[in-house]
Amino acid sequence: MEELIVIYDKEKRDRGRDSYIRAIKKQIPGVRVADVANLPEVGRSKLLILKPMNDGDYETLKTFLKCNPGRDIEGIGSGKLTITAEAIIRVIGPVDKKTVVIINQSDVLGRPLAKELIERGANVISLNSSYPCLDNLLTMTDIDILVSASGQGDFELDRELTRMIDVKIDLSNDLEDPIKITSVPTIEVLKDRMKS
């Protein structure tokens, strides 16, 4: 198995990212964790770049991965389905003819997830947390699956808006509804990618 280097920006605080790094260190033997300001020699290692990170540094690393797709374990530079998007798909299962709302339009989660779900036959509504008519959308649309990963600390959806939705995945603590999935098997996806 090739070595994995996880690159992050230690100057940026993020509890979710730090928890993910701890889980990776616990589950993947020999992983190296490096600050973007002090990058090691990467050799032939697989790279996982984690946000939050300075935009300039992130774009530089993303460009490197586009030029070296064999090192891109996440999929941000190579165009593969990203780790979190794949983990969500593993959790929700078949989506043909289902309506899925995604509250996240990032390149790492929202866009690749929406694209893959459409290819699998789902009807997808993709938006961000600032969408002005979200209450109306949630109450007037027959939604089968809601994926919320806003990343906004002040964004919250009342449980009355989501109670009729069968499957709710909440990766940013956005939903007041207690009946939800709050984690997806990202470490398992990462392990599978390390093997291939």
Language-model region placement:
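Glycine-rich phosphate/diphosphate-binding loop of Rossmann-like nucleotide-binding domains
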Residues: 3-30, 80-165
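Short acidic/histidine-rich motifs immediately flanking catalytic phosphotransfer sites
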Residues: 41-47, 141-145
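A short, well-structured beta->alpha microelement
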Residues: 30-41, 129
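Rossmann-fold NAD(P) dinucleotide-binding segment
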Residues: 42, 56-63, 152-168
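Conserved beta-strand scaffold positions in the cores of enzyme catalytic domains, especially
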Residues: 30-33, 73-75, 124-126, 168, ...
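Short glycine-/small-residue-rich Rossmann-like dinucleotide-binding loops
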Residues: 52-53, 147-152, 172-173
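Glycine/small-residue-rich loop that forms an oxyanion/phosphate-binding "nest" at active or ligand-binding sites
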Residues: 49-86
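Adenosine-phosphate binding glycine-rich loop
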Residues: 7-10, 173-196
